[in-house]
Every structure is written in C-alpha cells, then in structure tokens.
Regions:
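A detector for small-residue-rich transmembrane helices and their helix-helix packing motifs
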Residues: 1-228
C-alpha cells in the first residue's frame, strides 16, 4: 500500500533542515550543556568555538522560537529551493546565517570598543558603572541561537524574487513587498532602541536579510513578476 510522506511537498533540503533542527532542539533539552557548546559566543569570549558559526543556526531557545523559524522555513523554503536548485539553496541558507552572525558580532565589537577602547577586555580594565559591567557580561556570556538570520535571508529572497506573493498577518492578506520592508524597519528600530529584557539578536536578523540581498544581486536573479 502506498503511504504518502508526512512531509508532503516539502523539498529535500528544507526537509533535512527541519529534521536537523528538531534533532538539535530535542538533544539540547535532554543534554542542556549543548546550549553552551553550540550557541555562538562573541569571538573574544572564552566560550567561543569555531564550530559555533554553523551550529548556532540549529539551536533554539524555546518551543516558540523553533516553531516560528521552522514555520518560516516551510512556507518560504520550498519556493526558493525550486528557484535556486538544491545546492544553491543550501549555500544561500548557510551563507545568510553566517552573514547574520557576522553583523551581530560587528555590533557587539562596536559596543565592547565603546566601553573598553578595545575589541576585547584589557586585563586592567575596570567598569565605570553597573551598566557597562552588565553589557559586557551579556556580550561575553550569552550565546546567540536560532535560524532566524537564515529565515530573514529567505524573506529577502522572496521579497526580491516574488514580491506579489501574499502572507497572512492576523488573518489579513498582505503582499510580501509590503510585509518584508515593514518587518525589517521594525527590526532596525528594535535593534537601535532595545527595551529592557529584550534578548532578540535584531542585528542578526538584519544581517541575514542584508547578506541575502547581496547574494541575490551577485547571482543575478531578478523578480519573476511585476513588482507593482
């Protein structure tokens, strides 16, 4: 008897990314130390390891975090995998994830330099106040996790290539060409004006979209329908 795949029309690379993300999420909840080993830390932190540049993309903070990212991957990924082909889609996903982390690291480096006058913490450095101390503790001691940078890269690709596709925001249809810029503006605002307790790496989201834009232009893709 023929049994339909539970993944339906999900394309191969997207399917494998989903499986790997779920495996990592389960493993990190069963073995909590993986959260420290596989999250991405600021390069000057003693917790930083080279593999984190890739592994952080498969780590998620909670069920809502992984659910929202994987939902974006399911909705956008198959369209782009069919557009790019499997190999290029795979490369795009990881390159935008790395680009996202690069911008987040650059912002962290700027913040550290503003406080210490260096991109690290000098041996004789003494914080001027509690705010400086807490900022440095956050940068050095809290890892970055999630596929969001890559998902924002996918969003940028959809925006550039299929701007008239619609998504539903609170049951209201809105075209990609409006939704993505508004979402990115919100990320820029939240990144520049962070609120207390906000643990989201907004500049990683912006970095994923920015590197996605660069890749689409370098690869010579153009939108496949009228932008307006």
């Amino acid at each position: 008897m023929y049994r339909q795949s539970p993944f339906g029309d999900i394309t191969p690379v997207v399917k494998n990314l989903l499986i790997i993300n779920v495996i990592f999420f389960i493993a990190s909840n069963v073995i909590p130390v993986l959260n420290e080993i596989l999250a991405a830390y600021y390069p000057a932190s003693p917790l930083f390891k080279p593999w984190q540049i890739i592994s952080y993309m498969f780590m998620h903070g909670n069920i809502f975090h992984i659910f929202s990212n994987m939902l974006g991957l399911i909705f956008i990924g198959p369209i782009l995998e069919q557009t790019f082909g499997q190999k290029r889609f795979f490369n795009y996903y990881f390159l935008t994830g790395i680009g996202a982390l690069a911008l987040q690291f650059a912002v962290q480096a700027y913040e550290v330099h503003q406080i210490t006058g260096s991109f690290g913490i000098p041996a004789d450095y003494q914080p001027k106040d509690m705010s400086e101390s807490l900022t440095l503790q956050s940068i050095y001691g809290i890892g970055i996790v999630g596929a969001s940078g890559s998902i924002f890269g996918l969003m940028m690709a959809i925006f550039l290539l299929y701007p008239n596709l619609e998504v539903y925001l609170y049951l209201t249809p809105i075209k990609i060409k409006y939704f993505v810029p508004l979402y990115l503006l919100l990320e820029v605002f939240q990144g520049l004006r962070p609120t207390p307790g906000d643990s989201v790496a907004h500049f990683a989201h912006i970095g994923g979209a920015l590197f996605g834009f660069i890749l689409i232009k370098l690869w010579g893709y153009k939108n496949s329908n009228n932008f307006y």
